[in-house]
Amino acid sequence: MKKILFFLSLVITVGCTRAQNVASIQNIPDYRILDADSVYRTPANLKKNQPVMIVYFSPDCSHCQHLMNEIKGQMKNFSKMQIVMVSAVDYRMIKGFYKDFGIAAYPNITVGTEGNTYKVLQYYNVKTTPYIAIYNHRHKLLKAYEKAPKIEELAAIVKKA
């Protein structure tokens, strides 16, 4: 009986903690990233009334690379989405990722580093990459993923945005 009570209290605690995290990320974080063109970008650069997908990633993460390839392959589903890819790695790695994946061909994708500020990392409490947060056209959270979902699920949420 004690084990059951302990398990139930653990489930409730984890559930409440998770609910608090979702409530705390309802808005787009106040970030400042250095993009691949050596320009600093902030949320002020985002277009109004257009949905946003923030992806916290690492250029050398195989799951992140796979996600990028899948998004590129389904770009027709993501073309109206502003995609902001943020990392804490060195600028040279960001530049390499940008070039390797031909991101210059996709004007709706911004890739940048937050350097050692870790503001976005801490805002989302990122534990693994890629971390994805999708915001609607009013820039309010629709869905957050702690790991990459299937591209079909991601595309379906993007359509709702």
What are these regions (language model features)?
Residues 31-51:
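A short beta-strand-turn-helix
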Residues 27, 50, 127-129:
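Short, small/polar residue-rich loop motifs at catalytic or cofactor-binding pockets
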